[in-house]
């Protein structure tokens, strides 16, 4: 089916709870299942999502929610059997959940500038977030999957099972997940976003993700047409795929496309300098560091 996008995720998927989407593979799936107040465009610019607009003032930022953003249907959850429109209290719950010690979200830090009790639903369509200090990068932090809006009744009813039974507003919804085997997402028929011609998104009917840890098998799947996409190619396969000028090898030009696009990524090198655990370590010497 040309409307099914297939790829392999060699690192696997450990959770579908956006509060724990700390790695790239988890972020990709969270972006398919959930929306936040704002999101990044393909050009890495902040654009509206669940929030149609916002304004800053001396206290922080006020978000105005768009109408018609629906949670995907959840037949086992009272109130979500036919889906439900997102309201401001859902935003408050989702963000405050990051601070819940029982959730233990690694994304709690995105709220470091937010006042305690400073996430407020002014009415069903307006959310105020008060900051402790002026912090313009805050909007950028809200584009991360950590800030995704979830359905409170689904989280509370499912408890720890929410990691495998998500409830969001994204372009796709979960159809099947067998850990270490495959994950399948189906098109969310109630998704709110449309393209410039008014056509409802997404264009795809489904996304199929395999979890094959061997990169050689993944590359073979790409060459044989079982996968539509591969990122982060191992150097061992570069000679087969590409020519000396960095383009596609002639034998692959009829079947594959090579695209180079901007990619938002941060790497760092950390040096452990705790003298309680590294007695005698050269890293304790600032001249070495």
Predicted regions and their residues:
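Short, low-complexity disordered leader/linker segments with a strong preference
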Residues: 1-2, 118
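A structural "hinge/loop" feature
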Residues: 10-27, 50, 75-81, 137-147, ...
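Extracytoplasmic/periplasmic ligand-capture domains
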Residues: 42, 60-62, 66-104, 160-163, ...
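Short, well-ordered beta-strand segments
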Residues: 5-10, 230
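Surface-exposed binding/hinge segments that line
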Residues: 55, 90, 103-152, 178
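Acidic glycine-/aspartate-rich tracts in secreted/extracellular proteins
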Residues: 13, 68-69, 134-135
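N-terminal lobe/hinge region of extracytoplasmic solute-binding protein
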Residues: 8-58, 96, 165-167
